[in-house]
């Protein structure tokens, strides 16, 4: 299944989303089926197959049992029947379409201003209304106090279109896991990276959760192409790469409508990440529909993020998260952040809300490296505040209160 960045887009209303052109199906083999038997059977149908994923720690996951199947173009129209046929072979545990959804980017037309003094010298901070809504002045005061000490320098991975690693307001807080991920021809990933981890109090650009570089750095794992599209295989490989390279928090500002009620492959990928100590966060989506029909936010173990505006109303585009097991809200309208080539712009979307949560989680994982996704969500939910539509947004994160609860819990 393939996804796009979750900048605000119109509702997708299509019975069968576009499929990957080079591997239309993702198939999990059962334990009784060896690869050679599978390949012989696929070859007899006139199809081709290849392994989909290569996790470093294969003993922890079933992801290494997944194969891509290339279906001839003249048979793609019969995909539902082909999936049923594969399920009836006795060789598979799971069959899913490898869907593609394309990016539609939404710049913000207006940016609410903030007059509150936050105690940092970033010159564009007055264009970041979200910092006031999140009481970031209290958060910065807490981070610079003697009460809060990082136990490690955490790593927040932005799984997206790439990140401009040379940006003036990102470079000092950026860690590269692979140079091929460190540019961003699209701009979406760089915007998300700045929300989570732009260098703060450096006299340049914008502020973020990186008040001090001691707590976390950001990195990039490129999972979306320059045109803004990527397959389910791309996203899952990105999750594997990020975790295998040591990421503590994975931020997925992407997603799309899915025909699959069971997100088995995505859920297995999230389980692989959480078993290795990481927390995975995903955008709720921007179609003003039920986020339970949107992937990968509907995968088991994922923390989902909805978007609110400066009045703490659910953003008109934000999906409703009442059926997502772990869901939170963050600002997602008129969000001002970094863009490639030392630029800055405002955008709308649950894409923008997601890295607010990811950046905060980066700080929390730094303070308590053993923090799990469920423990983190419990703290963020209990310390969050109501929006004007909490049942459909989840609680709005409050960073200072969350860190205060974390260190209080640690002290106990």
Where would I find each of the regions flagged by the language model?
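Extracellular S/T/G-rich loop segment that most often corresponds to the catalytic His/Ser-adjacent loop
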Residues: 160, 278, 294-366, 370, ...
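C-terminal subdomain of the subtilisin-like protease fold in secreted/lumenal serine endopeptidases
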Residues: 243-254, 264, 269, 276, ...
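Substrate-binding/charge-relay-adjacent region of secreted/lumenal peptidase catalytic domains
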Residues: 194-197, 229-252
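Loop/turn elements at helix/coil->beta-strand transitions in domains of secreted/extracellular proteins
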Residues: 91-93, 152-155, 214-217, 244-250, ...
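Protease zymogen maturation seam
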Residues: 60-62, 87-155, 163, 168-169, ...
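Subtilisin-like serine protease catalytic core
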Residues: 140-175, 182-232, 298-301, 311-313, ...
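Primarily auto-inhibitory N-terminal propeptides
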Residues: 1-114
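Active-site-proximal beta-strand/loop segments in catalytic clefts of secreted hydrolases
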Residues: 29-30, 97-100, 158-162, 196-199, ...
């Amino acid at each position: 299944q393939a996804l796009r960045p979750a900048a605000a887009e119109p509702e997708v209303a299509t019975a069968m989303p576009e499929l990957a052109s080079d591997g239309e199906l993702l198939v999990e083999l059962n334990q009784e089926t060896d690869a050679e038997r599978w390949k012989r059977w696929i070859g007899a149908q006139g199809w081709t197959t290849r392994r989909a994923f290569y996790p470093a720690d294969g003993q922890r996951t079933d992801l290494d049992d997944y194969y891509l199947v290339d279906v001839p173009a003249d048979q793609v129209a019969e995909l539902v029947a082909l999936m049923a046929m594969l399920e009836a072979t006795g060789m598979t545990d799971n069959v899913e379409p490898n869907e593609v959804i394309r990016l539609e980017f939404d710049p913000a037309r207006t940016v609410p201003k903030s007059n509150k003094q936050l105690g940092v010298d970033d010159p564009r901070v007055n264009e970041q209304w979200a910092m006031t809504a999140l009481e970031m002045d209290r958060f910065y005061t807490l981070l610079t106090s003697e009460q809060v000490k990082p136990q490690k320098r955490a790593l927040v991975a932005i799984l997206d279109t790439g990140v401009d690693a040379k940006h003036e307001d990102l470079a000092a807080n950026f860690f590269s896991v692979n140079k091929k991920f460190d540019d961003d021809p699209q701009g979406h990933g760089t915007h998300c990276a700045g929300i989570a981890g732009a260098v703060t109090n450096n006299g340049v650009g914008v502020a973020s959760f990186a008040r001090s570089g001691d707590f976390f750095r950001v990195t990039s794992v490129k999972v979306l192409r320059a045109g803004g599209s990527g397959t389910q295989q791309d996203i899952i490989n990105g999750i594997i790469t990020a975790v295998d390279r040591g990421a503590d928090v994975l931020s997925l500002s992407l997603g799309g409508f899915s025909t699959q009620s069971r997100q088995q492959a995505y859920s297995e990928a999230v389980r692989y990440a959480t078993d290795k100590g990481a927390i995975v966060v995903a955008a709720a989506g921007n179609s003003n529909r039920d986020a339970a029909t949107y992937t990968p936010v509907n995968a088991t173990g994922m923390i989902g993020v909805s978007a609110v505006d400066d009045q703490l109303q659910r953003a008109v585009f934000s999906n409703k998260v009442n059926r997502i097991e772990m869901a939170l809200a963050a600002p997602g309208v008129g969000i001002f952040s970094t863009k490639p080539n030392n630029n800055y712009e405002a955008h709308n979307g649950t894409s923008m809300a997601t890295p607010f949560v990811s950046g905060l989680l980066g700080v929390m994982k730094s303070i308590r490296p053993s923090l799990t996704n469920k423990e983190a969500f419990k703290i963020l939910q209990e310390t969050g505040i109501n929006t004007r539509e909490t049942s459909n947004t989840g609680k709005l994160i409050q960073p200072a209160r969350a860190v205060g609860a974390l260190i209080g819990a640690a002290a106990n």
